[in-house]
Each structure stands twice: as C-alpha cells, then as structure tokens.
Amino acid sequence: MSNLLKEFNEQQIKLLSNREIPKFKSGDTLRVTMKIFDSAGERIQTFEGVCIKKRNNGLHSSFTLRKISYNESIQLQIFLYSPTIESIEVVKFGKVRRAKLYYMLSLFGKSARIKERIDRSKKSS
C-alpha cells in the first residue's frame, strides 16, 4: 500500500514541478510570485520574506515566509508544489544555525535581521 502512495506522490510531483524550484534553507530571503483568484478575476502577487521553516514531505512539502509590513508581522505558509505558484526566487542567502527559526517570530526591527551567507566555494578571479 505504501508503495502505491509513494508512486502516486512521485507522479504528482513530476506533473506539478514544471517550474524551476531553487534550493533554499531557513534564513534565506525568498521572492514568491503566485496567482491570486478574486472576484475581479485573476492577478499576480509577489510576496518577499524570510523563510522561517521548511518542511520536506514529498508532495506535501511546504515552507513558511515572514515579512514585516507597517510594523505588523505577516506569515504565509506556501506549499512547494502548489499550482498557484508562478515562480520562487532566492534574493539573499541567510546565515543561521537553526532549521526552524521560531525565535524570529518575536523579533522586530534591527534584531530581526539575518546575516548574509557568502559562498566561498566560488573563487572570484
């Protein structure tokens, strides 16, 4: 039974992953473009925030983004293989030591900033 579910999940992932999904971790700043359906029709909305957590669970993989707008914290949980997602772009790579950044939920202002991770494997010439 579990093999059937595993095969089904793999097939659905292949069908839904027609776009490029970048590699990212918690602490990275992401820009997600998604379709929003409302009474006026369909529009494209961009959400940019820090990835608080990432959950790898096959077809049900998701990640949570957090941004601060007008001194209000906004969190958005997004499913990785959702058909409403147009694109995912990594803006900055963050340097953190945790997989789940729940301590960030109570931070505002300068204390909520994350240092940028510099990839030293690429040699600048």
From Swiss-Prot:
GO terms for molecular function: structural constituent of ribosome. One of its GO terms (biological process) is translation. Disulfide bonds: none annotated. Keywords: Ribonucleoprotein, Ribosomal protein. GO terms for cellular component: cytosolic large ribosomal subunit. It holds the Pfam family Ribosomal_L19. This protein is located at the 30S-50S ribosomal subunit interface and may play a role in the structure and function of the aminoacyl-tRNA binding site. Belongs to the bacterial ribosomal protein bL19 family. This is Large ribosomal subunit protein bL19.
